[in-house]
């Protein structure tokens, strides 16, 4: 996060406080519960202890809770099992449509190179159109799910033209290895691992298909009660992001040690990652709204939603 961006984010919080968005802040926070997946910035922030250091003077303990994908993390946010956490673009949309008490706090960039739909190199599947009638592994409600429906729509197809097989990344990896699915839609490091193992045929990249971000989310009530904790946490993430940008080789090594994914794959993933964090802009809201509208149009969510209703603080709207 650049200095300008940090100042801008702090200004948003200050303005929101001045307009009474938060009301009286809680006297203090004993524990901050962070939901994360073992990818990218969360791992680096945890390893370096930047959030712990930022909150130490307040006596706040930081607890990290691991998730395998975004949808269960969003549900944990909704019920207060965790206070803040990271997901891709699709999980908060499904959550908001289901009435989850979550808010968008900040955005993390994605250059779209670390998420793809692919098939094995010896497969007859060479384009998205070739997926018609085929089995495609994907995590339901994940960012890869969004990539899949967007890529199909772009090719004049829909989910009804394929057989989606909803699997966790670990289960999808096994299914792909044993040819129980014909193609796979997934993100790094699973995509990078598949690249190093199979040299797959890339059918679609996120960068060629849609504009997407990763998001730092919070439980709505928690964000309202503890804006100071949110600000300090985002500041700390900015510090970790700057370090990661300047030390991608060390990022790869750290992720390798934490995940046991081979260093070659983690190096590939780290080198194409963009590390930053910034406020939710009008353009980000518009991109996310486009995705939400697509999901409603395709019947993936039960009602239309307005992304702006879930952007925190309300004064950014």
Regions found by a protein language model. Name each.
Residues 20-26:
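Sec/Tat signal peptide C-region and signal peptidase I cleavage site
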Residues 90, 164-165, 170-257:
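Pocket-lining segment of extracytoplasmic ligand-binding domains
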Residues 293-317:
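Conserved C-terminal helix/tail region of periplasmic/extracytoplasmic solute-binding proteins
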Residues 5-10:
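N-terminal export leaders
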Residues 53-60, 276-284, 307:
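Short, solvent-exposed loop/beta-turn-alpha elements that line the ligand-binding surface or hinge
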Residues 54, 76, 80, 134, ...:
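Structured segments of extracytoplasmic/periplasmic soluble domains
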Residues 27-158, 165-166, 182-186, 203, ...:
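Short, glycine-/small- and polar/acidic-enriched structural segments
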């Amino acid at each position: 996060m650049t200095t300008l961006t940090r100042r801008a984010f702090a200004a948003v919080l200050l303005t929101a406080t001045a307009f009474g968005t938060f009301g009286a802040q809680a006297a203090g926070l004993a524990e901050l519960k962070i939901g994360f997946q073992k990818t990218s910035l969360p791992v680096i922030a945890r390893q370096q202890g930047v959030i712990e250091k930022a909150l130490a003077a307040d006596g706040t303990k930081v607890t990290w809770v691991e998730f395998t994908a975004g949808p269960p993390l969003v549900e944990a946010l909704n019920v207060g099992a965790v206070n803040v956490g990271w997901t891709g673009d699709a999980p908060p949309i499904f959550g908001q449509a289901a009435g989850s008490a979550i808010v968008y706090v900040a955005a993390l960039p994605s250059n779209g190179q670390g998420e793809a739909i692919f098939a094995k190199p010896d497969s007859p599947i060479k384009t998205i159109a070739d997926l018609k009638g085929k089995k495609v592994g994907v995590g339901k409600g994940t960012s890869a799910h969004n990539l899949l429906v967007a890529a199909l729509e772009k090719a004049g197809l829909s989910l009804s033209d394929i057989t989606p097989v909803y699997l966790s990344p670990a289960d999808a990896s096994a299914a792909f290895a044993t040819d129980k699915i014909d193609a796979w839609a997934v993100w790094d490091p699973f995509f990078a691992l598949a690249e190093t193992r199979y040299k797959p045929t890339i059918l679609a990249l996120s960068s060629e298909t849609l504009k997407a971000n990763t998001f730092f989310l919070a439980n709505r009530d928690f964000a309202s009660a503890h804006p100071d904790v949110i600000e300090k946490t985002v500041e700390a993430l900015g510090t970790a992001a700057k370090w990661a940008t300047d030390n991608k080789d060390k990022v790869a090594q750290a992720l390798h040690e934490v995940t046991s994914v081979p260093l070659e794959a983690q190096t590939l993933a780290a080198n194409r990652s963009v590390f930053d964090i910034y406020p939710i802009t009008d353009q980000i809201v518009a991109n996310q709204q486009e995705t939400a509208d697509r999901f409603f149009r395709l019947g993936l969510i039960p009602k239309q939603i307005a992304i702006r209703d879930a952007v925190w603080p309300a004064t950014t709207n």
